[in-house]
């Protein structure tokens, strides 16, 4: 049975957005997924998406999905690609435009939508079975990250305002799917002149407290504009 009756009247019936919402949690890259409770996807896990409204830009639709799901207003949002395989949806032709959002886990206040049975963070390396082509979309995004993080400082949007060098290294390792040599990594990061020592230490940790750093916003913006090359 088609689920066209579930589409709001103010939305297009053949164009959707899927928002891949990522966060770092204890050194692991995680993605927010939803188990739907209606339509063809009922009882199954998938990306968080919605139909595009007739009077809405596609990027605005993607932002709306992230904002209404996480409560976060300011986050990194970028278009991944359009996915329009003729058989991606079993009943009728639907094209989706995928965006990825990078959020800080501690800033999120997860809000369950109307067509939501359950919503949960998953490690990107341990995903449940997903609806339609959503696994392919996620895999495409993870491959995209491997290039993007080496040439733009996009991943930094996942870190807290003040962070340790270990947290920064864990971020790169998670997005590149590699284990990095600690001294070599720190040497490369220092050459970028991107970090400012906060002259503070971690608090409330069982292990030896590490120094905290923050990004130099001026250098950060230049790197976003002109890019860089991080080879490992």
Residue ranges and their predicted role:
Residues 13-17, 59-63, 67-110, 115, ...:
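Active-site segment of metal-dependent pyrophosphate-handling enzymes
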Residues 47-55, 157-158:
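Short histidine-centered catalytic/ligand-binding loop motif
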Residues 200-232:
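Long, intrinsically disordered, low-complexity Ser/Thr/Pro-rich regulatory/activation regions
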Residues 100, 110-144, 158-166, 184-193, ...:
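NUDIX/MutT-family hydrolases
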Residues 1, 24-25, 31-34, 55, ...:
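Core subunits and conserved enzymes of cellular information-processing
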């Amino acid at each position: 049975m088609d689920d066209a009756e579930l589409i709001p009247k103010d939305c297009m019936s053949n164009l959707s957005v899927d928002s891949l919402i990522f966060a770092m949690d204890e050194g692991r890259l995680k993605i927010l997924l939803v188990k739907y409770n209606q339509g063809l996807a009922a009882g199954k896990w998938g990306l968080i998406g919605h139909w595009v409204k007739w009077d809405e830009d596609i990027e605005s639709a993607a932002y709306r999905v992230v904002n209404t799901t996480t409560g976060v207003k300011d986050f990194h949002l970028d278009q991944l690609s359009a996915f329009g395989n003729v058989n991606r949806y079993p009943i009728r032709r639907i094209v989706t435009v995928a965006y990825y959002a990078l959020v800080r886990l501690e800033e999120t206040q997860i809000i369950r939508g109307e067509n939501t049975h359950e919503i949960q963070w998953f490690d990107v390396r341990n995903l449940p079975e997903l609806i339609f082509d959503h696994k392919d979309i996620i895999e495409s995004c993870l491959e995209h990250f491997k290039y993007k993080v080496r040439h733009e400082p996009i991943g930094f949007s996942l870190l807290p305002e003040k962070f340790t060098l270990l947290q920064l290294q864990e971020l790169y390792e998670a997005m590149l799917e590699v284990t990095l040599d600690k001294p070599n990594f720190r040497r490369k990061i220092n050459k970028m002149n991107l970090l400012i020592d906060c002259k503070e230490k971690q608090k409330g940790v069982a292990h030896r407290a590490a120094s905290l750093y923050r990004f130099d916003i001026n250098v950060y913006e230049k790197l976003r504009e002109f890019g860089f090359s991080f080879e490992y």
